[in-house]
Each structure stands twice: as structure tokens, then as C-alpha cells.
């Protein structure tokens, strides 16, 4: 009778190990399938360092192609923002300026209120 109990416990341990292996495989494949690929742009096929912005439903995906940057990307972005601000002060593209300001204000409001406790 002791041999039956030993076989029973070893088969239960094997079944438990098989179940854990199955669960591990399921979750690893499920997480890989849940990840979505970044959209490709037709200009990326040439190579080099290129920035591609793709606007999704609620997010902005910025993809840089190449090994490393030289740090001038942020400076270039800041320069573009300063040029847009100067154009707004001169009165050019008034509708675009108002729309940009409203969007930036709404975005800041969202950032500062998203983690606050609601009454």
C-alpha cells in the first residue's frame, strides 16, 4: 500500500509541475501577443537617423532610428517651439495659436489632475 501512495504523490507532483509549465507558457505567449508593433513609415527604409511621429488614439509615438543622438534633438525642438511662439506674437496663424494654447492648457490640466483624489 505504501508503493501506491508513493506513485500517487509523484503523479500529483508531475501534474502540478505540468500545470505550472502550461500556465507559464500561456502567460508568456499572451503578453507577447498583447504587445503591439510600432507603425512603420515609408521613409524609414532608407536608414540613418530619422524621427517619425505617429499619432495614435490618445498617444504620440516618437521613434528614433539609429544608434545614438548627439543631444541636439532637444535643442532643435525647443528652437521650433520658440519660432512658433514668435509667429504667434506677430499675429500670424492666429487660429492655430489659439488652438495650440487651448490644447496645451488642457493637457497640463489633465497631467496635474489625473492622480488627485476625486471628491
UniProtKB/Swiss-Prot annotation:
One record GO biological process: cell differentiation
Similarity comment text for this entry: Belongs to the phytosulfokine family.
Lineage top rank: taxon: Eukaryota
Name the UniProt record assigns to this protein: Phytosulfokines 2
The protein's role, per its UniProt record: Promotes plant cell differentiation, organogenesis and somatic embryogenesis as well as cell proliferation.
Pfam families reported for this sequence: PSK
Modification after translation (UniProt): Sulfation is important for activity and for the binding to a putative membrane receptor. PSK-alpha is produced by endopeptidase digestion. PSK-beta is produced from PSK-alpha by exopeptidase digestion.
GO terms, molecular function: growth factor activity
Signal peptide span: 1-34
Protein's organism: Oryza sativa subsp. indica
Proregion positions: 35-109, 115-119
Positions bearing Sulfotyrosine: 110, 112
Primary location recorded for the protein, binned into one broad class: secreted
Gene Ontology terms: cellular component: extracellular region
Compartments it resides in: Secreted
Cross-referenced PANTHER family: PHYTOSULFOKINES 3, PHYTOSULFOKINES 5
Amino acid at each position: 500500500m505504501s508503493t501506491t501512495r508513493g506513485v500517487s504523490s509523484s503523479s500529483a507532483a508531475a501534474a502540478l509541475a505540468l500545470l505550472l509549465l502550461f500556465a507559464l507558457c500561456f502567460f508568456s505567449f499572451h503578453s507577447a501577443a498583447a504587445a503591439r508593433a510600432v507603425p512603420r513609415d515609408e521613409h524609414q527604409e532608407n536608414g540613418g537617423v530619422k524621427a517619425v511621429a505617429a499619432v495614435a488614439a490618445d498617444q504620440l509615438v516618437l521613434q528614433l532610428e539609429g544608434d545614438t543622438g548627439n543631444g541636439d534633438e532637444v535643442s532643435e525642438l525647443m528652437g521650433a517651439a520658440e519660432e512658433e511662439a514668435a509667429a504667434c506674437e506677430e499675429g500670424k496663424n492666429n487660429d492655430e495659436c489659439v488652438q495650440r494654447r487651448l490644447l496645451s492648457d488642457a493637457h497640463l490640466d489633465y497631467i496635474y489632475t489625473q492622480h488627485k483624489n476625486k471628491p
